[in-house]
Amino acid sequence: PFTFRDAGKIVGYDVDLAALMCSSLGVKPEFIDTQWSGVIPALYAGRFDVIMSSMSYRKERLEKVAFSIPYAEASQAMLIRADDASKIMSVKDLSGKVLGVKLGSPGEMMKPALEKEIVAAKGTGFSDVKIYDDHPSAYLALSQGTVDGVLNTLPTLGKVMKDRPGAYALVRPVGKLNWAGIAARKEDTEIVNWMDSELSKLKDSGEIYALQEKWFG
């Protein structure tokens, strides 16, 4: 629900929030669809001015970009089939099972640490890790039994469960509590200051929480 295509149009929480922020300037934001793996190089190449796509705070990213204050929770959780809820109660229970992740996502980056944790607890890690170009493909694989768990942000998976009641269950927490911010080039301090100011105003007015209720439930 952060950013996705609906009938070819880019929509979502990020889109609505960006529109609210830009309304104070009397302009409409332009959205450029970009491969996640190359999004930071594209930012510095000047293809766009900010990255607004549920980007979580990570050490390696903080070295490359400047972040706004948080605008959403970005902690990871794991989606499983509802029928497996009594058998998979933590990530460690995915020992000997198949994990699904999106290419270049925080979930993929967490895989080595999770594998190490599972091996330490159970003696055996994942039987396989399948990597998908997008999360909907991973959810479909979960429904079909190709994978046993899919990693994504907690707010996003909450929306997935809301849309298909009774089909899925959640395993959380996975890793540490984390937050998403809007990223800009390090030298663009004026943009970062503006983003922080707008986000603070929208938090104070409650508008940002109304958007979260709309998209995340």
Q: Predicted regions: what is each one?
A:
Residues 38, 55-63, 110-117, 136, ...:
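A ligand-binding cleft/hinge motif common to bilobed small-molecule-binding domains
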Residues 82-99:
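Flexible hinge/capping segments at coil-to-helix
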Residues 30-41, 86, 124-140, 176-178:
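Short helix-initiation/N-cap motifs at beta->coil->alpha
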Residues 3-5, 18-27, 107-131, 161-165:
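Ligand-binding cleft/hinge of the Venus flytrap
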Residues 1-54, 194:
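Extracytoplasmic small-molecule ligand-binding "clamshell" domains
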